[in-house]
Amino acid sequence: MKFGLYFCLALGAFTTVNAQETLTLSECLEMAVDNNLSLQRSRNEIVKGKISISENQAKLLPQVNAVAQINDNFAPPVSVTDGRAYGKAYNVTKTLQYNAAIGLQLQMPIYNQMARTAVEVSKIADRLNQLSYEKAREDIIMQTAQTYYMAQNTLEQIRLVNDNIKRLEELRNITQAFYDNQMSLEVDVKRVNFNIEDLTVQRDNALSMLQQQYTMLKFIIDYPAEKEIKVTDINPGQIDEVNACGLNTGLYELQLLDQKKVLAQKQTKLAKDAYLPTVSLTGNLMYSAYTDKFENWFRSGDSNHWYGSNGIGIQVRVPIFDGFGKRSKIEKAKAEEESARLGYEDAYKKLQANYMNAVSEVNNCQRNYKKQYDNYTLAQDVYNVTAYQYKEGVTSMTVVLQDEMRISEAMNNYLNAYYRYKVANLSLLKLTGQLEQLK
């Protein structure tokens, strides 16, 4: 019975451990790009852009419509003609009460510059949709990486705090033994216990923060919320070199703004094209019938006769005056064109400044990270020496606790420097167009 109970408990523990999946940064980035709901919406916008191109191209193709019409003229109209051939001034002819028509109508653009420019505009808009998707994809990669680094940082904090707690627990055992042998004071035991409790609170807060970061990471990569995940451990002291090869002028922000300039130029052209004439080919193939009684259409005879008519022609439409509406559209389009140009220049100069600051920030954070890591390692060595001296009765509890506080302070500085360094590296990778190197 006991064996079965132990087996079930062991199996449950094994299942719980296995249920927690460790995800690398590369795996998270791949999931984010494939599954993120915001990116799926962006991909849907690309599909809509393709459809918009087809809609505008359809305006350049022939349009054929089938038409059918039937009229009941309660008061039939009359036709008045010259009646002198019949010996009277006017000849008045009354039309029949019912008439019907059925046939095909054709209209095909021969020259319509507005429609052609509209196709070009829709293609530019499609390109903007694609660039917007790439920009959104890049933003998701940045957000995923930052969240992943934050979780790694918190996980490392928990590991280091646990190490500190273990050290203090060993110190407490030694101090308790000293107290039992009247070699230390009760207040020394209380001091150690207080520090242990303080670190335990820090660890609990870090555990809560880690769960929140995991929840955010799962949301970004669209990972099942009910499943547990874990990030990989950091490599303490490792420096990732980034090639500061200059600002990448092909950044998606710049490409988007450049395409907006092109779009504004095309929209100006589209407004000007409204002054141009349009030429269309028209044609029809119709059949008409007339009767004085509706039921005659269901009988054979002279009263049920359909008359055919067909023709082909050219329709020319020349804009003359529209209340200065076209002129206002052209002025507005030119203003949009100038705004797009200024927006591009402003963004380019801002990104250049960001790049220079990013290079400086990476160099500074790299030095600071290495220094803080060395300080943390040194603080551990100093504490180990002090703790050994305390065991030998050479130094006091106060000195040991002071060195332990220095370890905690050095740990916090080291973790903050690590996160700042990783984020600075991430920004530089983005600005230099090397974001795909993330792994």
Indicate where each model-derived feature is located.
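Bacterial Sec-dependent N-terminal signal peptides
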Residues: 1-29, 33-36, 436-439
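Sec/SRP-type N-terminal targeting helices
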Residues: 40-44, 57-58, 110-137, 187, ...
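Outer-membrane beta-barrel architecture
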Residues: 54, 105, 267-270, 315
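Charged, solvent-exposed structural "stalk/scaffold" segments
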Residues: 150-205, 364-419, 427-431
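Periplasmic alpha-helical coiled-coil/stalk elements that build and connect Gram-negative outer-membrane
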Residues: 51, 139-250, 361
